[in-house]
Amino acid sequence: MDELTRRRFLSVVPAAAFIPAGISASVHLPETPAPAAFPQQNVGRVREMVAVSHGNVARVKELVSASPALARAAWDWGYGDWETALGAASHVGNKEIAAVLLSAGAHPTIFSAAMLGQLEAVKAFVAAVPGIQQTRGPHGITLLDHARAGESVDVVKYLESAGGADVRYPNETLSEESVSGLLGTYAFGAGPTERLIVSRNNRGMLVVKRDGEPDRNLFHHGARLFNPSGAEAVRLQFEPAEGRATTLLVVDGPLQVRAER
């Protein structure tokens, strides 16, 4: 089509002809109030998307069908422990949910590739960024554990031979007396949820949570110094050094929060 013909064509063809299928030239939908965070996506939906991607395939399909961009949702569970929807499916080995998310536009990662048994993709990541196999996934879960979760035998063998793909956090043993001295509630403000609760989970592991939020596992570096899961650079220091702790200091880069009981 030459330029003159093209101009004539555009002058007679209505603009509506170029609107994508399924979208009317004059869309008449019931008006709803714009959310406070608009145009950002609903925070509750984002959090739910990541949560259900651990195992609720029906709900995952519902959410991405309504809002495909949620396939790329990410959530910070605390202290910078970021997890994507695909990351959630990957570390629990849920291949069905991973497939749904990827088909909806989720970004593949070395962790999803390891879980799905995509050996050549994992090798390509390692070749492109030597040492990347040492990077931990959400909650501090290792790359090798992702491969194990997906029962990806060939990837497991490769990562074991490559080395560095299963480095755990330090976690020095604490006596029962020492643990007991840390348990309790530490307030960092006057608000009803401005409290950090230190307890043991049903596996006996020491955990911390803000009131109303999920538990975060704690890993002991010695001398009552810990890091929370998924945040190896963050430090939680209990004081004093012995006996019943009265202060919990959280250090996250420039942020320092002191909680007392």
Regions found by a protein language model. Give the residues of each.
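N-terminal secretory signal peptides and thylakoid transit peptides that target proteins
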Residues: 1-17
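C-terminal segment of N-terminal export signals and the immediately downstream linker at the start
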Residues: 23-56
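Ankyrin-repeat boundary/"N-cap" motif
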Residues: 39-51, 72-88, 107-114, 135-146
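Ankyrin repeat structural motif
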Residues: 56-64, 94-102, 118-126, 152-160
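Ankyrin-repeat C-terminal turn/loop position
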Residues: 68-69, 105-106, 130-131, 163-165
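Short domain-boundary/entry signatures in modular proteins, especially
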Residues: 102-112, 164-172
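Peripheral terminal and inter-domain segments
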Residues: 165-261
